[in-house]
């Protein structure tokens, strides 16, 4: 069984076996008897490397044995291995030639937090969002068939990701086309129970064997000649298996279900995977793992150890940390509790982001009004629409990048019917080390084009609180988009204050250029305003715009500058351009925002500097444009 560690090593551990297995080809040269020692070394090295870089933690510890077994049994990268989401892919990265670069994980120009096709031939599909692996692996299996190639496609998906409808759509389609593929359910949501032991492992070996498959097909041919005999035999078989394994659903969908087996038992994993590798058609293997396996603190607190920050140096830096305010998600969580206490109609809905969106306190105080729908963004939005139809006031707490998955429901089910649903959109803008798959780069663009939608962008924590109240009481759909991380520590209202809809506020009066800020770049814009004696406006509302103020500013300034942490294309700057054009107002404009490419992972400050959205970048761009206009 795996060795249990109790501390994250600060010094690089000795890993002689791991050092000899830089690639899967080298891994496959090791004796099978050495693999359990390799697993211990890989687990210890993972602890060390994530301690140096920070990153997703518990999921990778839980798939050490499975990762070794997959690369040992399958001929990767010729056999296609697709990881769902990618939180668990760090051991895979270590075993596929990237061990020496793990220290650069999630850093600028370093390894990505998730599998990336551009990073390694072993990363067969880029991921970050959940529940895509089965569809992708199915596509690869069909491509292999069309090209006459004899290779396997393997999808590894977690029990949480399997709750999404997309996963079941793929499961259903795979059996319809008879795909030659293997789906592995990495079930780390339950402990290894009594049925995941010797008997279950033994049964899995039998069921997955070619002998069993041949006998089953032979029996089917013989019994099919007798009226009703095969159907009776099939039901007897399913009943016998059902007493020991929970795979009836997958069998009914047409998959050959095997398991559950202990995902930390390497001999059983190897034997079962070898058997299933040699079977044709859609195969489904259920493995049970423990998140955080082999690291005692993570086993005890898998949620807390889902991801960790890098270890602090033993001798702390003498440079004091800059004080900051509460996280925007914490401000939302407190507002939600305050508004729920004031209005019994309020309900909170989240697609599996209870901790990330800070609904923990709300769920504890108002459990009957809290709904975690799991990874089901489409359902979350239409559920909210149904509630709103009958007088309930839903607040959907969702990350910007995940709301993209429910865009049709947002328009068709909420906006077209003008329903009172508030979208609290967390992680808007750049998100740092998680990279482009998790960035909220497009929400202003895809929200502002929806008729009747109220769209707001706070500049600080108190503005967020006021906008949430304003959106909640708005007659129709409303969205407040706010970033990851902490605010500037603005004083918070004690009560629930409203904003005048569509009303911006001039934060600094100047001349020459007017900086129109949509969001949290207000502090940087004010610094630029001081340097250039420019006007600075906290726009607050993307939709509706403060049209009267825009007319006034266009008439009194040389240049209008829009600043937003959203794609420039179709963003708030575009809204200003469209308004001025409709009013036949010709005015020089400068749009600052996210460029027309995916900004790669780095520290947030590095990403903002790359995009010209830090104080220096904004000032430089405005000076250059003013110089051009005045030349």
UniProtKB/Swiss-Prot annotation:
GO terms for molecular function: 1-deoxy-D-xylulose-5-phosphate synthase activity; magnesium ion binding; thiamine pyrophosphate binding. Thiamine diphosphate binds at residues 87, 128-130, 160-161, 188, 295, 377. PROSITE patterns: TRANSKETOLASE_2. One of its GO terms (biological process) is 1-deoxy-D-xylulose 5-phosphate biosynthetic process. It catalyses: D-glyceraldehyde 3-phosphate + pyruvate + H(+) = 1-deoxy-D-xylulose 5-phosphate + CO2. Its EC number is 2.2.1.7. SMART domains: Transket_pyr (SM00861). Its cofactor is Mg(2+); thiamine diphosphate. Keywords: Isoprene biosynthesis, Magnesium, Metal-binding, Thiamine biosynthesis, Thiamine pyrophosphate, Transferase. Pathway: Metabolic intermediate biosynthesis; 1-deoxy-D-xylulose 5-phosphate biosynthesis; 1-deoxy-D-xylulose 5-phosphate from D-glyceraldehyde 3-phosphate and pyruvate: step 1/1. Coiled coil: none annotated. Mg(2+) binds at residues 159, 188. Homodimer. This is 1-deoxy-D-xylulose-5-phosphate synthase.
């Amino acid at each position: 069984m795996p060795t249990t560690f109790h501390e994250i090593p600060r010094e690089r551990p000795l890993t002689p076996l791991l050092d000899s297995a830089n690639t899967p080809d080298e891994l496959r040269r090791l004796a099978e008897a050495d693999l359990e020692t390799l697993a211990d070394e890989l687990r210890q090295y993972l602890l060390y490397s994530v301690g140096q870089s920070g990153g997703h933690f518990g999921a990778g510890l839980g798939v050490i044995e499975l990762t070794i077994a997959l690369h040992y049994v399958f001929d990767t990268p010729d056999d296609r291995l697709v990881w769902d989401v990618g939180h668990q892919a760090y051991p895979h990265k270590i075993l596929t030639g990237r061990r020496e670069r793990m220290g650069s994980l999630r850093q600028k120009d370093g390894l990505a937090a998730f599998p990336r096709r551009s990073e390694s031939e072993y990363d067969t599909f880029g991921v970050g969002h959940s529940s895509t692996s089965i569809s992708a692996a199915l596509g690869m299996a069909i491509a292999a068939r069309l090209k006459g190639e004899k290779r396997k496609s393997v999808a590894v998906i977690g029990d949480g990701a399997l709750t999404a409808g997309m996963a079941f759509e793929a499961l259903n389609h795979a059996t319809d086309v008879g795909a030659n593929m293997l789906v592995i359910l990495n079930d780390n949501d339950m402990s290894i129970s009594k049925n995941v032991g010797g008997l279950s492992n033994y049964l899995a070996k039998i069921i997955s064997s070619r002998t069993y498959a041949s006998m089953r097909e032979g029996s089917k041919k013989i019994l099919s000649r007798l009226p009703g005999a095969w159907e009776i035999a099939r039901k007897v078989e399913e009943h016998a298996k059902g007493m020991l394994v929970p795979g009836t659903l997958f069998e009914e969908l047409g998959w050959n279900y095997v398991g559950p087996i202990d995902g930390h038992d390497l001999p059983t994993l190897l034997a079962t995977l070898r058997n299933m590798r040699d079977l044709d058609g859609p195969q489904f293997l259920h493995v049970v793992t423990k998140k955080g396996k082999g690291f005692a603190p993570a086993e005890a607190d898998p949620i807390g150890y889902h991801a960790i920050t890098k270890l602090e140096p033993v001798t702390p830096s003498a440079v004091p940390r800059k004080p900051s305010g509460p996280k925007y998600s914490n401000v939302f969580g407190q507002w939600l509790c305050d508004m729920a206490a004031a209005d019994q109609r309020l309900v909170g809905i989240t697609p599996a982001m209870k901790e990330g969106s800070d609904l923990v306190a709300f769920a504890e105080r108002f459990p009957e009004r809290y709904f975690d729908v799991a990874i089901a963004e489409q359902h979350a939005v239409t559920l909210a629409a149904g509630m709103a139809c009958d007088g309930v006031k839903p607040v959907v707490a969702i990350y910007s990048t995940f709301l993209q998955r429910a865009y049709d429901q947002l328009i068709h089910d909420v906006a077209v019917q003008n329903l009172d649903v508030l979208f609290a959109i967390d992680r808007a803008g750049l998100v740092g080390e998680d990279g482009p798959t998790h960035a909220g780069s497009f929400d202003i663009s895809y929200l502002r084009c929806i008729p009747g939608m109220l769209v707001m962008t706070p500049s600080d924590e108190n503005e967020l609180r006021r906008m949430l109240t304003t959106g909640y009481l708005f007659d129709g759909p409303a969205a407040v988009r706010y970033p990851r991380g902490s605010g500037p520590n603005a004083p918070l209202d004690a009560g629930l204050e409203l904003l005048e809809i569509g009303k911006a506020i001039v934060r600094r009066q100047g001349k020459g250029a007017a900086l129109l800020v949509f969001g949290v770049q207000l502090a940087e814009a004010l610094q630029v305003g001081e340097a250039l004696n420019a006007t600075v406006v906290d726009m607050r509302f993307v939709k509706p715009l403060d049209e009267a103020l825009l007319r006034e500013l266009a008439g009194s300034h040389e240049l209008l500058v829009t600043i937003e942490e959203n794609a420039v294309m179709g963003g708030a700057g575009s809204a200003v351009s469209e308004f001025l054009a409709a009013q036949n107002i010709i005015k020089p404009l400068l749009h600052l925002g996210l460029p027309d490419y995916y900004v790669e992972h780095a520290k947030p400050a590095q990403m903002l500097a790359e995009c010209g959205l830090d104080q220096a970048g904004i000032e430089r761009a405005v000076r250059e444009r003013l110089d051009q206009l005045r030349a």
